[in-house]
Amino acid sequence: MAGVNVGDDKLVFESSEAVTVAPTFEALNLKEDLLRGIYAYNFEKPSAIQQRAIIPIIRGRDVIAQAQSGTGKTATFSISMLQSIDTNLRETQALVLSPTRELAVQIQTVVLALGDYMNVSCHACIGGTSVGEDIRKLEAGQQVVSGTPGRVFDMIRRRNLRTKDIKMLILDESDELLNKGFKDQIYDIYRYLPPATQVVVVSATLPHDVLEMTTKFMTDPVRILVKRDELTLEGIKQFFVAVEKEDWKFDTLCDLYDTLTITQAVIFCNTRRKVDWLTEKMREANFTVSSMHGEMVQKERDAIMAEFRGGQSRVLITTDVWARGIDVQQVSLVINYDLPTSRENYLHRIGRSGRFGRKGVAINFVTVDDVRILRDIEQYYSTQIDEMPMNVAELT
């Protein structure tokens, strides 16, 4: 592995071979209309992962790209796809798979924004929406399809999503996708794709078993990985609050509300039931909160996301369905009401605050039973999680 120091970004990158570092978007030799879209999107210079991963993807190599939450991973593969697409061919040429519907829609938004001057078509193919509408859109020809595995496989099986011209498969948040839940569907989809399809795997965390699985459908991939010790985001202050028992968490949360001048905050619980319970209890105590989880119908989830994005709702209580990749600029505080069930999800959750290097605060509610889990997370990421100080309001 060739180590490349990023300088200002204070990250040590590793790659499996020498990777060209492109300091500017011009250095990537992109199509003129794509470059216009990038600048219109207010990107000035490529982020560290974009500087390294876009060129090998454009050259047709299989790539495993790992970077922190909030470093511009979505734009990395969106730019690469848009550069590779033949805009005169009204057939699906790139397929992006995501673990959640919200992430699939967000990717569609980014692709359409960056491809604004290219007359590119991109469809979000997700569960919870009209199958008839999907079929109509796909029949018309969509150059990029961004979707969730279940609905995408359904559309391929029905022959509404034609795969013969697909040349690129992107697996976003691949650790979650390749975990038990989606693994079989990914393999089913992969079998329908042309043999020469280029595969790009993108994620903040790549546990060993995921890397093993990628060997099954990637050929000599270029690996661009951040060293694990660097993975807890710089600029995010992490604290814990010791709560002797579960019942005390609610009072602690209410106390925090009074002391924190919040721009926007996300509160994570481990189950849908807990989200509903906490939302109800907060409202009874006259706090304004909104909530979202995977059991809600798609229309409701969209409306809640739009409200939160627009700033009408300031506090969102949710499950891990929200933790991966959802980009809301104003979030400065994350509270883990429940500690996450996996170390990887801890990173995805706290990566929500302070995107693109802006400051943020993460507060973990820790019962006696949770101490071991917290110490494990701390050790795994070589980070420090201190007891929350009294002046926490000044830190956000």
UniProtKB/Swiss-Prot annotation:
Q: Name one GO biological process term.
A: rRNA processing
Q: Which residues form the Helicase C-terminal domain?
A: 235-396
Motif Q motif, per the record, lies over: 23-51
Domain Helicase ATP-binding, residue spans: 54-224
Pfam families membership? DEAD (PF00270), Helicase_C (PF00271)
Q: What is its EC number?
A: 3.6.4.13
Residue positions of motif DEAD box: 172-175
Answer yes or no on keyword Cell inner membrane.
no
Catalytic activities: ATP + H2O = ADP + phosphate + H(+)
Disulfide bridge partners, by residue number: none
MF-aspect GO terms: ATP binding; ATP hydrolysis activity; mRNA binding; RNA helicase activity
Q: Which Gene3D superfamilies does the entry link to?
A: P-loop containing nucleotide triphosphate hydrolases
Q: Which InterPro entries match?
A: DEAD/DEAH_box_helicase_dom, Helicase_ATP-bd, Helicase_C-like, P-loop_NTPase, RNA_helicase_DEAD_Q_motif
Keywords in UniProt for this one? Answer: ATP-binding, Helicase, Hydrolase, Nucleotide-binding, Nucleus, Ribosome biogenesis, RNA-binding, rRNA processing
Q: Which residues bind ATP?
A: A67, Q68, S69, G70, T71, G72, K73, T74
Its predominant location is nucleus
Q: Which GO terms describe its cellular component?
A: catalytic step 2 spliceosome; nucleolus
The record ties this protein, via PANTHER family, to: ATP-DEPENDENT RNA HELICASE DBP3 (PTHR47958)
Physiological role? ATP-dependent RNA helicase involved in 40S ribosomal subunit biogenesis. Required for the processing and cleavage of 35S pre-rRNA at sites A0, A1, and A2, leading to mature 18S rRNA.
What is stated as this protein's family in its record?
Belongs to the DEAD box helicase family. DDX48/FAL1 subfamily.
Could you give the domain comment from the record?
The Q motif is unique to and characteristic of the DEAD box family of RNA helicases and controls ATP binding and hydrolysis.
Instruction: State what protein this is by name.
Output: ATP-dependent RNA helicase FAL1
- In its UniProt entry, the species of origin is given as Cryptococcus neoformans var. neoformans serotype D (strain JEC21 / ATCC MYA-565) (Filobasidiella neoformans)
